[in-house]
Regions:
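Short acidic-hydrophobic, aromatic-tinged amphipathic segments that line or gate anion-handling sites
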Residues: 137-147, 289-296, 403-407
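A short, acidic, amphipathic alpha-helical segment used as a generic capping/interface helix at domain edges
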Residues: 78-80, 232-233, 313-322, 366-377
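His/Asp/Glu-rich metal-coordinating catalytic cores
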Residues: 2-89, 98-253, 258
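Short internal beta-strands
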Residues: 110-120, 209, 269-277, 329-333, ...
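Short, surface-exposed connector motifs at secondary-structure boundaries
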Residues: 105-110, 178, 236-244, 264-266, ...
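Redox- and metal-dependent alpha/beta enzyme cores, enriched for Fe-S-associated oxidoreductases
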Residues: 315-355
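Internal alpha/beta domain cores that form substrate/cofactor-binding pockets in large enzymes
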Residues: 336, 341, 357-419
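Hard-cation-handling environments
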Residues: 220-318, 323, 387
């Protein structure tokens, strides 16, 4: 008999951890950190102890107490069974910290599978010094729609569309039917056909675990398309007489490439922070121009209408030296991500002080409520588990589909019958 339990993503956005068990074997889907900027016990200068980070997280309840997952050499005697049991595998949906951020603490004997692009992106991030907490994870590639047999399970990876390359959903075949997991998914991005293909391939699943991020934000009918974001960025480039300031998420590489192309098309050069530039170059992007503290300010002052400067919060003081008459700040889902981030208010204060107008042009990586319902209608599972949401009860299943609202902390849901 197969069971499903949830160890993250319950009542919060992000940090999904779905554990499927059968006959002593386990498949874990995603293993990320909670996204809680400015919150928790470690903030305002209080940091975790070097070499004791895993222990600090375990003792403060930040990560789940799942036995036989974590590295024994990082536990420091914590009373939880460590090391691999030889019967556990981890499958990661994509390279966002709330889905992959704990992989550095996974015992090295546990196989960690992901898409080829996710592995490649993680390698590029490592070149830039952006690595998961802990130790470098050993990632194994799972081919597109190429089943992997693991104990009694048969796990198949499908590409889906999200705001990061390499995003995947999974179908886990158990003795009681298929458990399908969307990971993070959308239909308004550049590749909606990928998400729709996944939904079609897992039609009739015993259970569908689906993200519900946008359910948390009240009534929404639609999301802006990615191509609309490109067009709005080009509009800003053309209509702004002076310097364009922009923030965007560097792991959204397709948007990065599109912005670079639009900027070149109107004769502007994008100046990237050094860490981003290193990552882009490791990924394989060409003609990546880096902000150089010794030379870039003079270049920008001489011809502000020929440049776009990528701004991160720690870059804000440099704006004091730049020509900002006729400038605009374009927010395209970069840092700070939104009003929930303490740095958001600080950014607004800086822009107000500098008298730079703010323009938000981004779009999210998560399906709208209407699109979530569309995906559920396409799959028509027996059981629906809404996850990765503050308001999962807002996802109303169609007739004939039973909705179970996951409870955190290891409660098992049997796939053999109703709980």
């Amino acid at each position: 008999m197969a069971d499903v339990s949830f160890w993250g993503g319950v009542g919060i956005i992000g940090s999904s951890k779905v554990l499927i068990e059968q006959d002593g074997w386990r498949v874990l889907l995603d293993f990320g950190l909670d996204f809680n900027p400015g919150g928790g016990l470690f903030r305002q200068g209080v940091t975790m102890r070097p070499s004791f980070q895993l222990l600090d997280r375990l003792k403060t309840g930040q990560i789940p107490l799942i036995p036989h997952i974590y590295r024994s050499d990082a536990m420091h005697g914590y009373p939880l069974a460590a090391g691999s049991d030889g019967k556990t595998a981890l499958f990661v949906t994509h390279a966002h910290i709330d889905h992959i951020g704990l992989t550095g603490w996974v015992d090295p004997a546990i196989p960690i599978y992901c898409s080829p692009d996710t592995r490649r992106l993680m390698e590029a991030l490592a070149v830039a010094g952006d690595v998961p907490e802990g130790y470098p994870p050993r990632l194994l590639e799972a081919g597109e729609e190429s089943p992997i047999n693991f104990g009694p399970f048969r796990v198949t990876r499908y590409s889906v569309d999200h705001d990061v390359v390499g995003a995947s959903g999974y179908a886990v075949e158990t003795e009681n039917g298929v458990v399908a997991f969307t990971g993070d998914i959308r239909l308004h991005g550049r590749h909606p056909e990928k998400s729709l293909n996944f939904a079609q391939k897992v039609q009739g699943a015993r259970a569908l675990v689906i993200e519900g991020t946008t359910l948390s934000f009240g009534f929404q009918t639609s999301q802006r398309f990615e191509t609309d974001v490109d067009d709005l960025f080009e509009e800003a480039l053309k209509e702004t007489p002076g310097l364009v300031l922009v923030t965007l998420y560097p792991r959204n590489l397709e948007r990065v490439e599109a912005f670079m192309e639009r900027a070149r098309g109107v004769g502007r050069t994008i100046l990237w922070p050094e860490s981003m530039a290193r990552m882009f170059q490791a990924w394989g992007l060409s003609d990546v121009q880096t902000w150089e503290a010794s030379t870039s300010p003079n270049r920008v002052r001489q011809a502000p209408s020929q440049y776009v400067v990528v701004v991160q919060p720690d870059f804000l003081p440099w704006l004091l030296d730049l020509p900002l008459a006729g400038a605009v700040f374009v927010h395209a889902n970069g840092e700070p991500l939104g009003v929930f981030d303490p740095k958001w208010e600080l950014l607004q204060e800086w822009l107000k002080f500098l008298r730079v107008p703010f323009w938000s042009i981004g779009t999210g990586g998560h399906a709208s409520p209407d699109d979530l319902n569309r995906l559920v209608e396409l799959v028509r599972p027996d059981i629906l588990f809404p996850l990765h949401s503050q308001e999962p009860d807002r996802l109303i299943p169609p007739p004939g589909v039973v909705r179970w609202l996951p409870q955190r902390g290891g409660r098992r849901y049997s796939l053999a019958g109703r709980n």
